[in-house]
Amino acid sequence: MFSIVLAFLTAGCGSRLEWYPPPEQRPSLSLPSSLPFGYFVAMSDPNAGAYIVGGFRDQSEGVWRWTHERPVLQFYVPRAPRLRLLVDLTFPDQTFAQTGPVELTIRLNGKEFDRVRYAKPGSQEYTKDTPWEWLHPDAVNTVALEPDKTAAGPDGERLGFVLTRAGFVE
């Protein structure tokens, strides 16, 4: 019995070890430490207000924030081989019942970058490769997310959509 156990234990042992090189390393997106904001923000971040240029409700509702007619964010975009703009947003049932389908115009640094039509309420994820000629590398960049329609809130406030997170990813 001992010889059977010993045979099983040594069966996988071999004298030849295969060697594999480590995967290619590249630096992660890095930012100057003096900036109050970076290349991506979640609305749950206590520092989310530093990214907001305008067009948002003043207070956050926890992990998300209401937008108004022309929400604008600012990001510091470091040099990277390839970046995508990512936006997680929600069109709540209550406001969508007033607006119907919404067309969102996305502007990068003041230039129209894309138009997207959202035909149903609920959570949505927008992502698109961002050509370097649209960005200012190692500098502050603005992203405007303009809905073509807004809904009237209970106090008359114009509500666009709910933003959860946005920014640039590799």
Regions found by a protein language model. Name each.
Residues 14-82, 94-97, 150-169:
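Glycan-recognition and processing domains
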Residues 9-12:
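C-terminal motif of bacterial Sec signal peptides marking the signal peptidase cleavage site
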Residues 97-112:
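Short, surface-exposed beta-strand/strand-loop-strand elements in extracellular ectodomains
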Residues 83-89, 106, 124-128, 133-152:
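Short, well-structured beta-strand segments within conserved domains
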Residues 1-2:
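Bacterial N-terminal signal peptides that target proteins for export
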